[in-house]
Amino acid sequence: MKIISYNVNGIRSAISKGFIDWLQQANPDVICLQEIKASPEQLPLLDFELAGYPYHYWFPATKKGYSGVAILTKVKPKNVVFGTGIEHMDFEGRNLRVDFDDFSVMSLYLPSGTNSERLSHKFMFMDDFQNYINELKKEIPNLVICGDYNICHEAIDIHDPIRNAKVSGFLPAERDWLDAFLKNGFIDSFRFLNKEPGNYTWWTIRVPTARANNKGWRIDYCLVSEPLKERIKRALILPEAKHSDHCPVLVEIE
């Protein structure tokens, strides 16, 4: 099964830039979207179905035009779960899961820490998400968590680790959390197969030349639970897709 994760930074904006044509060409079995910034009634749902995705699930934020996640799939899931059931985690539409016979796929949009208030919210979300996943793994050991984690794990994952050492997204406490999350039973599928530097998934629009000069951050991941480790066939970053300030990431599970 080929799975793609993509923070589209506004699905309507991405559609206007050719997203649906790209989706047909990329042809994943499942695509996890983050930061959709829209509700399903605002979207051309028939176009997604005509593109080959009859099953599409949308979890927008309560606040209009903000956050939100979605999953589109060619294969009908046996179960769909919107959110975690924890109010402070769910009102911004940050977590959606589909269950298939063999494993489950989750679309995750971890909060960013743009100011002290949001950083506190981010750390609370991270702690509660870890606890949620610890319990979920007892029920669903085969789990793929795709999304925008808003964290660079290692120095190799960011273009300027020294200058960004005190910036949210690369703070020691954030990196420690991701390190512990991985050690608790997950594989960073891209790093499992690729140890090369210069592979990023997000480039700030505040610096217009950042993407052209590849001054980026790798904050989008497809994390695969340990029982699926030997079934990771491919893991790629797809920087040629330019519908967003992020690019898609891909994992293929046998």
Model-derived segments and spans:
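Active-site beta-strand/loop signature of hydrolases that rely on acidic residues for catalysis
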Residues: 6-7, 23-41, 105, 133-155, ...
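Conserved beta strand-loop-helix elements of the APE1-like EEP
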Residues: 64-80, 208-230
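Metal-dependent phosphoesterases centered on the DNase I-like endonuclease/exonuclease/phosphatase
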Residues: 51-55, 127-215, 219
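Active-site beta-strand termini and strand-to-loop segments that position acidic
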Residues: 74, 98-101, 225-226, 251-254
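Active-site-proximal beta-strand elements of phosphoester/diester hydrolases
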Residues: 1-9, 102-112, 146
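Surface-exposed cleft-lining segments at the edges of enzyme active sites
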Residues: 85-86, 110-126, 162-166
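Structured beta-strand-rich core segments of catalytic domains in phosphoester-bond hydrolases
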Residues: 37-39, 45-113
